[in-house]
Amino acid sequence: MDSNDSEFGIGDWQRLLRSLGEDPSRQGLRETPERVTRAWAHWTRGYKQDPAAILKTFADGGESYDELIVVRQIPVYSHCEHHLAPFFGHATIGYLPTGHIVGLSKLTRLVNCFAARLQVQERLTQQVAQSLLEHLQPKAVGVILRCRHMCMESRGIAVAGEETVTSAMLGDLKTNAAQRAEFLALAESHE
């Protein structure tokens, strides 16, 4: 799995370590290039995943359900495209179905699909919402992401603990104040 023209691999990580003044052959670093190569393959696996395949609907008797479906506290782990620094937090997803529902775990898988790419939080939020709208064709979609960004916490302003909140409201959640209020209440509920 060595480096070639199209893949950043073990040899590249060894060169990076040498450029930092490290010896890639020393005890603590010997296996680091291989581990980091595998880690980045994992952290960017979303490029090889298809949201349409994740959001296949199924018939289980829930097709007549016509109230909001909300899943909260979906873990988000991604890397910013500007510094390759991690950002992480939680997502809340809600949608108002029109006969097409998916297993609840599919919402987590969808977040993981888009988060496992180089991202900005704003685009990640929109990609999740647009994908749900396109593949499930619901009356409404709401997505809220709350994340901490290591590019802010470990460099630059270097303030720990700040949280960035982004949202995307589509369909009735964008135009219907009552629906939007219900989604936001369910998203914030601690009961």
Swiss-Prot record:
Molecular function GO terms recorded: GTP binding; GTP cyclohydrolase I activity; zinc ion binding
Tagged with keyword Hydrolase: yes
Keywords annotated in UniProt: GTP-binding, Hydrolase, Metal-binding, Nucleotide-binding, One-carbon metabolism, Zinc
Catalytic activity: GTP + H2O = 7,8-dihydroneopterin 3'-triphosphate + formate + H(+)
Keyword Metal-binding assigned: yes
Pfam families (UniProt xref): GTP_cyclohydroI
Pathway participation: Cofactor biosynthesis; 7,8-dihydroneopterin triphosphate biosynthesis; 7,8-dihydroneopterin triphosphate from GTP: step 1/1
Binding site for Zn(2+): C80, H83, C151
A GO BP annotation: one-carbon metabolic process
SUPFAM superfamilies tied to this protein: Tetrahydrobiopterin biosynthesis enzymes-like
A GO CC term assigned to this protein in UniProt: cytoplasm
EC number: 3.5.4.16
Protein family: Belongs to the GTP cyclohydrolase I family.
NCBIfam families: folE, PRK09347.1-2, PRK09347.1-3
Description of how the protein assembles with itself and partners: Toroid-shaped homodecamer, composed of two pentamers of five dimers.
Protein name in UniProt: GTP cyclohydrolase 1
Gene name in the database record: folE
